[in-house]
Amino acid sequence: YNLLLCYTGNIHVSANIIKDQVKNYEKKDAFDAMCEVKALAYAMKDELLKGNLHSFGKLLDYGWQSKKRMSSKITNPQIDELYDEAIKAGALGGKLLGAGGGGYLLMYCPYNVKHKVAARMEQMGGQMADWNFELRGAQSWIADENRWNYNEVKVHLPNGDYEFKL
């Protein structure tokens, strides 16, 4: 109930960001930031297990500030402004998913300001995305139109097969 997912509109190549992080590995500030991100992941897990969601949100912000120090390619002025405006609207913290550089921004906010944060992010050009937790792990679909029979649909599930005539 407290997480928002916002598409930043930025397209990026993750490999370039990761290469830059590897290059920066030997720099003290970038290395310290990597260590902080790792420590924060453990701290966030502990806060979630304790049910302390407010602290979890604040730790997300610490993590984002640390991640940005790992490479100058992780963020850009548009992403920073989107993030900062979400914080001003009441979000406690957030992060770009994946390597950074664009894609989706995940924000944690108290439920009573969630709609205010979402509205502000949309005003700033972000695109809010609907999402749900998937308890079965990552799911993917592949559609091969050449093999598709438009007269019937068959679904294979662990507990049985289903066939639908169209």
Predicted regions and their residues:
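Glycine-rich active-site/cofactor-binding loop and its immediate structural neighborhood
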Residues: 102
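C-terminal nucleotide
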Residues: 1-94, 106-166
